[in-house]
Amino acid sequence: MKIAILGGGMVGSFIATELSKEYTVTVYDNMKLKLKNVKTIVMDVTQKEFQEKIKNYDIAVNCLPGFMGFKILKTLIELKISCIDISFMPENCLKLSKKAIENDCIVIPDAGVAPGLSNLIIGNIISNNDIEEIRIMVGGLPKEKNPPWNYKAPFSPIDVIEEYTRPARAKINGKIVVRKALSDIQELDVEGIGKLEAFLTDGLRTLLNSDPKISKIPNLLEYTIRYPGHASLIEKLIK
């Protein structure tokens, strides 16, 4: 199987390295990368030349920043290329569902940790249980705090900012609502780590429109975890 990885950042490079252990992998990026057993092609994926190149692959993994995600996913579907997508695009990727079906494409959107792995875990839980409320709490924390932010972006910094500014969809008392990102701050105390905070973020869009059993769950919310005080600092920065 020939796989194209679109975007060779921290996450894209890791995915490429892991997949290269079993498959033929090529990374498309705007700079040359040195990855073992992985070919890198320096190319602007928004150009026509890319559309000719991508036809030679069985599947693509879209690891581009969110602002590029929807356009590239749309292009892949039009070219009948199946895709796993981890880009945090602001657009509703489900609008491309009909075209993907028509073109016999398999598309797995929002396939990161959360959304992504969290969706799979919840799918497994609700298959055998009646659930009243689900709260997803997820976040990447640096081992060493580095004031004042006490944070290090594990993926595209642009998309980290998106987490803080994009209105968060949630389900409360059976109704889908939209809340301000960084709101509804929760305090946590995690063994071995200590006190943390969590605030609402927009990671539920595909989950809210997936398994029919989800519609029967009255309350469903996603929170992003950070060290205490982070949300307040970001709020001040945004203002």
Residue ranges and their predicted role:
Residues 87-109:
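Rossmann-fold NAD(P)-binding glycine/threonine-rich loop
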Residues 75-93:
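ADP-ribose/adenylate-binding Rossmann-like module
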Residues 127-239:
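C-terminal catalytic/substrate-binding lobe primarily of soluble NAD(P)-dependent oxidoreductases
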Residues 23-36:
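NAD(P)-binding Rossmann-fold cofactor-contacting core
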Residues 45-56:
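Conserved Rossmann-fold cofactor-binding substructure of NAD(P)-dependent oxidoreductases
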Residues 3-7:
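Conserved N-terminal Rossmann-fold NAD(P)-binding element of oxidoreductases
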Residues 58-62, 83-85:
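N-terminal Rossmann-like NAD(P) cofactor-binding module of classical short-chain dehydrogenase/reductase
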Residues 11:
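Hydrophobic/small residue at the entry helix of a nucleotide-binding pocket
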